[in-house]
């Protein structure tokens, strides 16, 4: 288009649906099994929430286009692979699709219970109405077992930084949003601020977790925390894996530097020495500058008597791109291998994503702004977080595949805790990984 002309107008969900093929599925019940009861088909309420209203709109658009009814089927967390196997063994379709945490989807994929979405007729992972580039972050080679996006509520699982406004204001850091929107917002900067705020504690030989002021903590200082920090480095075990054969693409120099920097971050005296309720209490009592955790934890922090703000997780270094990393609890959508009519499933899944387009993302954002955020600066931070939501294919599938975990999550968390050389520690795993890659994710 010529310079100065109108920007390209984005299509609405209704308009996207018009671009999809016509079919008459009148009377068909489209079943989504999910661990998130009420997310796909909200319970009827007198005053439905914003996200519920967006879900209802999506379901109505799908019904109007194809004559179907969208129904939810309850699924217990951790049981997906078993449920799918039981149904398949009995020769019955368990559901048209499943919405479950990444770790459950990975286990089901590894058990051979999920369809490669590229073999689902009509289904288009790269359609403009998908959440990009997130929708192809879960692709390795020409294989994808689960897709993530606003339609699956993925943004709720993004890792973010909460800061204690009172504590930081007092220390002279009174424009955190401005800082977070600049090039200067790196993990090193966060650590520097944290260590300044916790200066007295830094000087102590043995800090007291129940009284002293600390710099940062997560809720559980567990593997998910370590791997979220790792993702700030921008280094991915498989690189940009979509369309590329499954192989290790670590940039060893960059990776080692990231591991060393993060190791020091985790070893700093500014890091709160406990986790769980005591970390939450410290943040609530104004003794913790930063709380690094999932976006959906905002609802818990809202119950605390503390003045907090929201910031995107910074990039590890100034030349890196910030990401809002996802973890193993992030919900994605997969399709059971046994399908009565895979063409119908593909067409209806396109409709599911097209009919969720934009307004589901907007509803998720508005929900946070409306209930938890204080002002326009905070709304802009939320938008930055949403704009940078990314996942790492290796980390998404690692919970199901020991061969992937061995060269990614297991190894990285151990190196972050104990130090060591990535390259030399990878060496013993290379042969078995290369073997695995010959027959998986082709």
Spans of features found by a protein language model:
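Extracytoplasmic/periplasmic solute-binding protein
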Residues: 33, 92-98, 102, 140-161, ...
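Short, solvent-exposed loop/beta-turn-alpha elements that line the ligand-binding surface or hinge
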Residues: 122-129, 180-182, 235-255, 318-324
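Conserved C-terminal helix/tail region of periplasmic/extracytoplasmic solute-binding proteins
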Residues: 337-346, 356-442
